[in-house]
Amino acid sequence: MSWLNKVRNALPFTPKRDTPDNLWIKCPSCSEMLFTKEYEDNLSVCPHCDHHGRIGANARLEQLLDAGYELLPAPKVKEDPLKFRDTKKYVDRIKAARAANPHPDALTNAFGRIEGQKAVVGVQEFAFMGGSMGMAVGNAFVAGTERAIKEKCPYVAVTAAGGARMQEGILSLMQMPRSTVAISRLHAAGLPYIVVLTDPTTGGVTASYAMLGDVQIAEPGALIGFAGQRVIQDTIREKLPEGFQRAEYLHAHGMIDMVTHRRDLKTTLAQVIDFLMAGKAAA
């Protein structure tokens, strides 16, 4: 036996440690590798480039609402009324989305307080079929505004959507006027409607309730628009300006009221609600 074998045999056996697959995350903007826990503790904002990552409904509610908030039940709807099928059945897509998400559809409502200010908050879950707006989202939106009217508080919509849910056809598009009527009822009750635009907010959602807020707030770098940039460029046959459809561009051109960093969002919302509700509280 050679001395090499003697050394190799003398080395102690150390079993390979299992490393979690999700220990690291790569920033989609600057490509820096980040510890997932540190990234999540930083509200899913990159500490190197300040890129605001997409977060789920539960994380968003935990970030915005004080402890002890109430999750509102999701209204029931008839599933797959058109018996739609593309490469797979719509009912199968719904089942797969529900298996991967904690909520039954793409909009979740909660009632609670934002730094002591009462509010009903509706958060869209982009991970649920791209946050697409269908009958379930429409019903949840209406239910959220109705609860806000009952509680005499604002309704805050946190949008993140690719648009209308094509598998529901005209029934999906009907949610655009439905949500508009719900906002009108909120206003008739003398209550504010506040929108927080997050990345991405596009399509039929942008063309309806996402742009109807009394106060329009956006997160930095959020993509906000109706049609995609390629579609617009091919239609008008012109190159679009730098940063087109981003939150900062919309703010510079008067389309939204403010761009607010995620860490400041809760305090900003509390201040806005306090200002808008001051006269009503005194009345």
Swiss-Prot record:
Chief location of this protein within or outside the cell: cytoplasm
UniProt xrefs under Gene3D superfamilies: 2-enoyl-CoA Hydratase, Chain A, domain 1
UniProt catalytic activity: N(6)-carboxybiotinyl-L-lysyl-[protein] + acetyl-CoA = N(6)-biotinyl-L-lysyl-[protein] + malonyl-CoA
Alphabetical keyword list: ATP-binding, Cytoplasm, Fatty acid biosynthesis, Fatty acid metabolism, Lipid biosynthesis, Lipid metabolism, Metal-binding, Nucleotide-binding, Transferase, Zinc, Zinc-finger
Cofactor annotation comment: Binds 1 zinc ion per subunit.
Pathway: Lipid metabolism; malonyl-CoA biosynthesis; malonyl-CoA from acetyl-CoA: step 1/1
InterPro entries: AcCoA_carboxyl_beta, Acetyl_CoA_COase_Trfase_b_su, ClpP/crotonase-like_dom_sf, COA_CT_N, Znf-ACC
Name listed for the protein in its UniProt record: Acetyl-coenzyme A carboxylase carboxyl transferase subunit beta
Originating organism: Novosphingobium aromaticivorans (strain ATCC 700278 / DSM 12444 / CCUG 56034 / CIP 105152 / NBRC 16084 / F199)
